[in-house]
From Swiss-Prot:
Chain residues that bind ATP: G171, D172, R173, Q174, T175, G176, K177, T178
Matches recorded under SUPFAM superfamilies: C-terminal domain of alpha and beta subunits of F1 ATP synthase (SSF47917), N-terminal domain of alpha and beta subunits of F1 ATP synthase (SSF50615), P-loop containing nucleoside triphosphate hydrolases (SSF52540)
Main location class: mitochondrion
Pfam families on file: ATP-synt_ab, ATP-synt_ab_C, ATP-synt_ab_N
NCBIfam families: atpA, PRK13343.1
Source organism of this protein record: Brassica campestris
Keyword Secreted: no
Subcellular location: Mitochondrion; Mitochondrion inner membrane
Cited InterPro entries: ATP_synth_asu-like_sf, ATP_synth_asu_C, ATP_synth_asu_C_sf, ATP_synth_F1_a_nt-bd_dom, ATP_synth_F1_asu, ATPase_a/bsu_AS, ATPase_F1/V1/A1_a/bsu_N, ATPase_F1/V1/A1_a/bsu_N_sf
Protein name: ATP synthase subunit alpha, mitochondrial
Record key words, sorted: ATP synthesis, ATP-binding, CF(1), Hydrogen ion transport, Ion transport, Membrane, Mitochondrion, Mitochondrion inner membrane, Nucleotide-binding, Transport
GO cellular component assignments: mitochondrial inner membrane; proton-transporting ATP synthase complex
Keyword Transport: yes
Family: Belongs to the ATPase alpha/beta chains family.
Length: 507
């Protein structure tokens, strides 16, 4: 029987509708909350979920799958868990946790998920990057050879840092660890102003973990006043944020820094501080019923920090020659650097800057213990001129500390010992520096050169800072520029007479 045109039209319409019926359907795997509390949700029914996958709760809060068990999945909640109830639906997103990255992030303050919290609207053009990626392999790397200047005389001369290095800042609370980190960010301002290309610019990422909101607010204000926020990104997971966000923040900040590293640029990332991240991870692990180990930390707490810090690297020329330099911060208790987390991070990093409360209260600020501080790879990146002028200073300081202990007994000292004590006292005074006042490298070289060559030996200690200010302002700009290339016999002639003359005027 032949269909009428109208019936044929209807048949075709039905066929196309049936064929396309399932085209717009999206099949989601969903589970149900079995129990929830303390930022951890146990969910039943997500059988195909991946480790580290993002999930979405019914109230819009996000979470991440950490424990994959036979029956349930242990999910950490990125936000408040008070609105999540037993029996609520949980949906898989199919994607691993990622955050925004790119130049649009510069000047912004974001949370651990990359959501802006500075009240300046949504982010403009950016890309999404996974928070957990593998560190660059051996062939993709190059040895550290470019200096990363902090603007601090004590650091740039005695424990130099190179681009792509990991240098630990370790010390008790209130010893100036954050101040060194902030000074380093501020010092990049004058380095970036001289940069002739994008590949010379240093971008900064500061990750605040478990700090007070007021402290983070002061920090933002300091960076804004110095116009340093324009080349910086701030990632804040404050003390009032849930433990999962404090755990995630360093990885999010690292992903943002890797954008610059992988695109042939240079970035500096500061984790302030990783002790609080370890405590947050311990809290999550214990709530997920993972077996505790030393100091109740889980067995993989070393891997927590090693996989993060290994992502800081200097890339080879074939892979863009970018770099990511890391300055992790660790807080010790009563100067105990042999505790679990401090020893872990010391063994992962390429050196450490040790700060001490006693030195801080004696007025030696930055309170760096030169004897315990070391930079394992930084000397290869140190400026030639700086290496030449401060070569003997570390040895002289060590001899001074040894002799100073005996000198306290007040016995008669010979002329050589007296000269050593004089020189050591001046070499201890020269590295002192006020906070948020980084010094350009060429001015540091002049000041240290004067101290090492004995021009300050007869000068009263309280006049050294005055001498320091007088030197660079009177030296010819050409000499300051030339100092960056290293000292030669010809270059030494000019500053010698001038520095001695200045010193005599202040004796």
């Amino acid at each position: 029987m032949e269909l009428s045109p109208r019936a044929a039209e209807l048949t075709n319409l039905f066929e196309s509708r049936i064929r396309n019926f399932y085209a717009n359907f999206q099949v989601d795997e969903i589970g149900r909350v079995v129990s929830v509390g303390d930022g951890i949700a146990q969910v039943y029914g997500l059988n195909e979920i991946q480790a580290g996958e993002m999930v979405l709760f019914a109230n819009g809060v996000k979470g991440m799958a950490l424990n994959l068990e036979n029956e349930n999945v242990g999910i950490v909640v990125f936000g408040g868990d008070t609105a999540i109830k037993e029996g609520d639906l949980v949906k898989r997103t199919g994607s691993i946790v990622d955050v925004p990255a790119g130049k649009a992030m510069l000047g912004r303050v974001v949370d651990a998920m990359g959501v802006p919290i500075d009240g300046r609207g949504a982010l403009s053009d950016h890309e999404q990057r996974r928070v957990e990626v593998k560190a660059p392999g051996i062939l993709e790397r190059k040895s550290v050879h470019e200096p990363m200047q902090t603007g601090l005389k004590a650091v740039d001369s005695l424990v130099p840092i190179g681009r792509g290095q990991r240098e630990l800042l370790i010390g008790d609370r209130q010893t100036g660890k954050t101040t060194i980190a902030i000074d380093t960010i501020l010092n990049q301002k004058q380095i970036n102003s001289r940069a002739t290309s994008e590949s010379e610019t240093m971008y900064c990422v500061y990750v605040a973990i478990g700090q007070k909101r007021s402290t983070v607010g002061q920090l933002i204000q300091t960076l804004e006043e110095a116009n340093a926020l324009e080349y910086s990104i701030l990632v804040a997971a404050t003390a009032s944020d849930p433990a999962p966000l404090q755990f995630l923040a360093p990885y999010s900040g690292c992903a943002m820094g890797e954008y610059f590293r992988d695109n042939g640029m240079h970035a500096l990332i500061i984790y302030d501080d990783l002790s609080k991240q370890a405590v947050a991870y311990r809290q999550m692990s214990l709530l997920l019923r993972r077996p505790p180990g030393r100091e109740a930390f889980p067995g993989d707490v070393f891997y927590l920090h090693s996989r993060l810090l290994e992502r800081a690297a200097k890339r080879s020329d074939q892979t863009g020659a970018g770099s990511l330099t890391a300055l992790p911060v660790i807080e010790t208790q009563a100067g105990d650097v042999s505790a679990y987390i401090p020893t872990n991070v010391i063994s992962i990093t390429d050196g450490q800057i040790c700060l001490e409360t006693e030195l801080f209260y004696r007025g030696i600020r930055p309170a760096i213990n030169v004897g315990l501080s070391v930079s394992r790879v930084g000397s290869a990146a140190q400026l030639k001129a700086m290496k030449q002028v401060c070569g003997s200073s570390k040895l002289e300081l060590a001899q001074y500390r040894e002799v100073a202990a005996f000198a306290q007994f007040g016995s008669d000292l010979d002329a050589a010992t007296q000269a050593l004590l004089n020189r050591g006292a001046r070499l201890t005074e020269v590295p002192k520096q006020p906070q948020y006042a980084p010094l350009p490298i060429e001015k540091q070289i002049l000041v240290i050169y004067a101290a090492v060559n004995g021009f300050c030996d007869r000068m009263p200690l309280d006049r050294i800072s005055q001498y320091e200010k007088a030197i660079p302002n009177s030296v010819k700009p050409e000499l300051l520029q030339a100092l960056k290339g290293g000292l030669t016999n010809e270059r030494k002639m000019e500053p010698d007479a001038f520095l001695k003359e200045r010193a005599l005027a202040l004796i």
